[in-house]
């Protein structure tokens, strides 16, 4: 019989830099999970994506064991990286901070595709374009 899940914890952590300090320690500690084991596993799996924020979904079972699933980086992080800006506009649609091409948009959409609720790449591109627009990033043809 399958183990019973007692909690699902969602965190967004820097790749390869998880440590027992907050937010990881308190989130996992209250469920009795071995924090160091999670940190070592997470850091090993994300070592090749240094500098990115990687969301993780941790399933905690009643025997205090756990499994985790890595998600794709947030669209905003990928857009900022492609545009080469530190942060989005504080007045989106009035002040534009950068421009990205349709090719860059397609690349970001392909990266995000497993986590998006979209059936094809065009729908995924529209979702990512909306995020870019809300950040004050223009899309050029």
From Swiss-Prot:
PROSITE patterns: RIBOSOMAL_L11 (PS00359). This is Large ribosomal subunit protein uL11. GO terms for biological process: translation. One or more lysine residues are methylated. Keywords: Methylation, Ribonucleoprotein, Ribosomal protein, RNA-binding, rRNA-binding. PANTHER family: 60S RIBOSOMAL PROTEIN L12 (PTHR11661), LARGE RIBOSOMAL SUBUNIT PROTEIN UL11M (PTHR11661:SF1). Part of the ribosomal stalk of the 50S ribosomal subunit. Interacts with L10 and the large rRNA to form the base of the stalk. L10 forms an elongated spine to which L12 dimers bind in a sequential fashion forming a multimeric L10(L12)X complex. Transmembrane segments: none annotated. It comes from Microcystis aeruginosa (strain NIES-843 / IAM M-2473). CDD domains: Ribosomal_L11. The keyword Transmembrane does not apply. Forms part of the ribosomal stalk which helps the ribosome interact with GTP-bound translation factors. SMART domains: RL11. InterPro entries: Ribosomal_uL11, Ribosomal_uL11_bac-typ, Ribosomal_uL11_C, Ribosomal_uL11_C_sf, Ribosomal_uL11_CS, Ribosomal_uL11_N, Ribosomal_uL11_N_sf. GO terms for molecular function: large ribosomal subunit rRNA binding; structural constituent of ribosome.
């Amino acid at each position: 019989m399958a183990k019973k899940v007692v909690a699902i914890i969602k965190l967004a952590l820097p790749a390869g830099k998880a440590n027992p300090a907050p937010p990881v320690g308190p989130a996992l500690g209250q469920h009795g999970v071995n924090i160091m084991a999670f940190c070592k596993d997470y850091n090993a799996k994300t070592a090749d994506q240094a500098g990115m924020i990687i969301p993780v979904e941790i399933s905690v079972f009643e025997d205090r064991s756990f499994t985790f699933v890595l998600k794709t980086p947030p669209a905003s992080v990928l857009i900022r990286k492609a545009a080469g800006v530190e942060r989005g506009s504080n007045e989106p649609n009035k002040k534009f901070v950068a421009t990205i091409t349709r090719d860059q948009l397609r690349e970001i959409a392909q990266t995000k595709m497993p986590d998006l609720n979209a059936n094809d790449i065009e729908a995924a591109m529209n979702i990512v374009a909306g995020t870019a627009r809300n950040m004050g990033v223009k899309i050029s043809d």
